[in-house]
């Protein structure tokens, strides 16, 4: 079956694995999924990124992070914002602050995929892919 929204699929896989306290999860590799994973790692939501497989079947293995003795997931919520049927674009001034700055909005800009903080620093807007907190 064809996957019509690979970003939503990636976010759902991470969310489900995190709720079940898995050590890692696999997502199909693409340039966009690599970029999103890199932003999540830079912001401290995932521990590590590695690749497994070859060619079309390449997958990203994302190591998930937990905190405290009860292993609470670092990722509490992931919400897809811009969807294939309704794209959401924001300029620099319109970029959202997730949870008053405690969360991260992942933005696809002309300079690549980055967090909302980086987009504000560079003075660029773009498509708001998702919120993570």
UniProtKB/Swiss-Prot annotation:
PROSITE patterns for the chain? RIBOSOMAL_S8 (PS00053)
Renumbered to this chain, the Basic and acidic residues biased-composition regions fall at 16-25
The organism's superkingdom is given as Bacteria
Name the UniProt key words of this record, in alphabetical order: Ribonucleoprotein, Ribosomal protein, RNA-binding, rRNA-binding
What cellular-component terms does GO give this entry?
Answer: ribonucleoprotein complex; ribosome
Q: Which SUPFAM superfamilies match?
A: Ribosomal protein S8
- Cystine residue pairs: none
Q: Which molecular-function annotation in GO is an example for this chain?
A: structural constituent of ribosome
Segments of this protein annotated with the region Disordered: 1-32
Example GO biological process: translation
The UniProt function text for this chain reads: One of the primary rRNA binding proteins, it binds directly to 16S rRNA central domain where it helps coordinate assembly of the platform of the 30S subunit.
* Record-stated family: Belongs to the universal ribosomal protein uS8 family.
Q: How does it assemble?
A: Part of the 30S ribosomal subunit. Contacts proteins S5 and S12.
PANTHER family, per this entry? Answer: 40S RIBOSOMAL PROTEIN S15A
Indicate what this protein is called per its UniProt record.
Small ribosomal subunit protein uS8
From which lineage does this chain's organism come?
A: Bacteria, Bacillati, Cyanobacteriota, Cyanophyceae, Synechococcales
